[in-house]
Amino acid sequence: MSTRISRSVYADMFGPTTGDRVRLADTDLIIEVEKDLTTYGEEVKFGGGKVIRDGMGQSQVTNKDGAADTVITNALIVDHWGIVKADVAITAGVITAIGKAGNPDVQPNVDIIIGPGTDVIAGEGKILTAGGFDSHIHFICPQQIEHALMSGVTTMLGGGTGPSHGTFATTCTPGPWHIGRMIQSFDAFPVNLGISGKGNAALPGPLKEMIEGGACALKLHEDWGTTPAAIDNCLSVADDYDIQVMIHTDTLNESGFVEDTVKAFKGRTIHAFHTEGAGGGHAPDIIKVASLENVLPSSTNPTRPFTKNTIDEHLDMLMVCHHLDPSIAEDLAFAESRIRKETIAAEDILHDLGALSMMSSDSQAMGRLGEVIIRTWQTADKMKKQRGALPQDSARNDNFRVKRYIAKYTINPAIAHGVSKLIGSVETGKMADLVLWSPAFFGVKPDCIIKGGSIVAAPMGDPNASIPTPQPVHYQPMFGAYGKALTVSSVVFTSQAAAAGNLARDLGIAKTLVPVSNVRGGISKKSMIHNDATPKLEVDPETYEVRADGELLTCAPAEVLPLAQRYFMF
């Protein structure tokens, strides 16, 4: 017997379905469900008197014979490829199916088998995304990792050795000994991690030993001397080993101007950090590299989005991070040359146009690693308010804009760093690195963080309480973040040369080393999903005004932001 119910009642019971719309937290961003892969009248739901019971929604199939380890029911997936309602199956730590879960003995159209060995995570009324990827980490302190994880970031790539002055300023781990010690420490953390070695050298030898010692990327940083010779050498070695190069260019233009740096690229693929320039780079026009096919441009989050406070906070932040002395006029001039309201305003618009492809933090070194996701959506909201709907969107929803912005911290950094076959999206065959959100808290405070199929973090009430929800509620590590469960549910990204050797045995680590691949000639700006625009960019050397294809890019600073104080009262 079938029964008709209203959309609102259905959404309350099973979550939104095709054509329903959802507001993302307190932003002006509205998403609309494009497709529902579940079957009306055959939805599965866990609980007393609900569907997932023996002989009903739960079959007799063993895990060995195909039942999933975990099913996330009725979740609204938000990813670069779509905004879709579905059940999601996880088996052996991998996403194995996206579709309709249930018992094939009594239900039609079942793609995902629920058996006695299947656990359930209720996704009704929740949004499911891929875990975030922050590709600009200064490994200054290990406590960063927990803060990033609790914000929804499950992969971190960067450099450093702890609170050394080299690490305060640069995302580089110098030399194979330091790289080895850092990789050994990674067994303690329930996230995917990768090390960038120091790329500043004019001869190949030092770079080769870092790559073979475990680095999955090389970083060129101006504080170590990003000269044309160092750039050319670093890219040449990276081509030989198929690893990515990230660059922080020469703010002072001592060894050349932006044109000289571009010439040293020789058309080779490179990931340009904080492409706007406040985080560092040729002043005032490093932003022009975002127009190049071979440059994969990213932002760091202190300039995201442009607000009335952005300029004021940057000067002191820069002086500390780059070991500068405010009593020295030249140091002060160096700092002031990097902070330009005109290029920061243009950065907002270039993100909205899809010309800036990725978002990252620059953790504790002019960046807040717990705010990569928040600031991405604050930027999207600011642009919706100031620029209106994108041409690809309708008056009903902002689906394309949401896909563009979520790609900036999920699939695009995964592509840029050669790991998109394993992570970066909610797709079958990929590691189950997933984040579940209540729509009212989307982008700010996750409901549940899943890493390699195990719940590793969640908000949790008083452990002595009779139920799990009484206050005080804090984000806490869960069982997946402890013991051997941690090391089998996360990996260390490294070079193919290191993974093929005896590095894991020599270092005595428990985590699996996973090689990066296809990050040189196989990718370009065109590979950046929804973020591959290459407008011709010009910067006025006197006024710092930025033009894209002749059009002035400017916008007012935000006075108020969503996803801000109302979410952090307690």
UniProtKB/Swiss-Prot annotation:
It is found in: Cytoplasm. It catalyses: urea + 2 H2O + H(+) = hydrogencarbonate + 2 NH4(+). The keyword Cytoplasm applies. One of its GO terms (biological process) is urea catabolic process. Coiled coil: none annotated. Transmembrane segments: none annotated. Pathway: Nitrogen metabolism; urea degradation; CO(2) and NH(3) from urea (urease route): step 1/1. Binds 2 nickel ions per subunit. Carboxylation allows a single lysine to coordinate two nickel ions. Residues 131-570 form the Urease domain. CDD domains: Urease_alpha. Its EC number is 3.5.1.5. Substrate binds at H221. The active site is at H322. PROSITE patterns: UREASE_1, UREASE_2, UREASE_3. It holds the Pfam family Urease_alpha. The modification N6-carboxylysine is found at K219. Heterotrimer of UreA (gamma), UreB (beta) and UreC (alpha) subunits. Three heterotrimers associate to form the active enzyme. Belongs to the metallo-dependent hydrolases superfamily. Urease alpha subunit family. This is Urease subunit alpha. The lineage of its organism: Bacteria, Pseudomonadati, Pseudomonadota, Alphaproteobacteria, Hyphomicrobiales.
